[in-house]
């Protein structure tokens, strides 16, 4: 099995787009890229826009050769109805979707999911509602969790986690569980016993606003619990990498992982690259170059459509 992070916060954008390849098939999970519409009361910097444009092209190129596309939920850093990523990437693919009708919040149920489904209409070879189901492809198994809360607050909606297994290993993509603040977030991982897990981490940059101290502590404790589950590698990237102090936030997790011989890494480091932290450094970027960014129309429409 080969795991290739395509776009993540440590690679410069909001995303969890990941390519997973087994000898039977190639799976692309959550093919979308986005930026924070506002951060530190500043719009995206030109460096962020340029990086998004670059990674969008990579994502489209990767999508040409995949067999399966997974959409874990309907936030714009996980799916795209055509703003930046053309919906032609779904042509002739098997598409596994989060249920657009059940265990879903209103903004996704009545606006985002229907719009997305209209945008890909008649393009995929097959569309499957994936929640809680398992699919076999020769020696590869793709399993999905039932819908679980998008972090501690169900108002943000629900996501599905995905496990991909071949004869040798299992990878779990947690989607947006915000570092697993609830015990229900751990159930799928304990059932599947993965060798590799890709997890988003807590919303620590919103501590005191959208995240309570108790929820952050629960997330760290549960990520420590995950590491004790027989893992070889943990890729922690996405929400927590929006925090300029992410390394300090994750220090307890790194300490336990080190004792257990588990590799904990960002997506960039997994690719043997230096993390490219842009959103969390937006103030610094504007100090270096305060010219307004030239934002393409599609990206402008995406940013105007709302955060997340």
Swiss-Prot record:
Q: InterPro entries from the xrefs?
A: Metallo-B-lactamas, RibonucZ/Hydroxyglut_hydro, UPF0173_UPF0282_UlaG_hydrolase, UPF0282_hydrls
What domain of life? Archaea
What GO molecular function terms would the record report? Answer: hydrolase activity
Name the Pfam families for this protein: Lactamase_B_2 (PF12706)
Protein family per UniProt? Belongs to the UPF0282 family.
Concerning HAMAP family, the annotation shows:
UPF0282
Q: What is this protein called?
A: UPF0282 protein SSO3251
Source organism per UniProt? Saccharolobus solfataricus (strain ATCC 35092 / DSM 1617 / JCM 11322 / P2)
């Amino acid at each position: 099995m080969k795991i290739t992070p395509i776009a993540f916060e440590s690679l410069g954008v909001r995303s969890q787009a990941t390519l997973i390849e087994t000898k039977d098939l190639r799976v692309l999970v959550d093919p979308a890229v986005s930026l924070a519409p506002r951060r530190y009361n500043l719009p995206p910097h030109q460096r962020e826009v340029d990086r998004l444009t670059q990674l969008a092209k990579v994502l489209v190129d990767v999508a040409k050769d995949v067999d399966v596309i997974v959409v874990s939920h309907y936030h714009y850093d996980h799916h795209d109805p055509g703003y930046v990523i053309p919906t032609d990437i779904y042509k002739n693919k098997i598409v596994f979707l989060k249920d657009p009708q059940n265990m879903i919040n209103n903004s996704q149920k009545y606006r985002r999911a229907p719009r997305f489904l209209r945008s890909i209409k008649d393009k995929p070879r097959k569309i499957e509602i994936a929640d809680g189901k398992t699919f076999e492809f020769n020696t590869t198994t793709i399993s999905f969790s039932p819908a679980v809360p998008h972090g501690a607050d169900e108002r943000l909606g629900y996501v599905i986690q995905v496990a991909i297994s071949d004869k040798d290993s299992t990878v779990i993509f947690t989607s947006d569980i915000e570092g697993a603040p609830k015990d229900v977030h751990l159930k799928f991982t304990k059932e599947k016993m993965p060798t590799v897990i890709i997890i988003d981490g807590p919303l620590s940059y919103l501590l005191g606003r959208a995240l309570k101290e108790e929820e952050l502590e629960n997330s760290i404790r549960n990520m420590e619990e995950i590491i004790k589950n027989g893992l070889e590698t943990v890729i922690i990237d996405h929400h927590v990498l929006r925090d300029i102090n992410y390394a300090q936030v994750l220090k307890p997790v790194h300490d336990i992982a080190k004792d257990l011989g588990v590799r904990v890494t960002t997506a960039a480091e997994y690719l043997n690259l230096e993390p490219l932290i842009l959103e969390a450094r937006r103030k610094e970027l504007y100090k270096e170059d305060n010219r307004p960014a030239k934002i393409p129309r599609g990206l402008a429409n995406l940013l105007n459509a709302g955060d997340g």
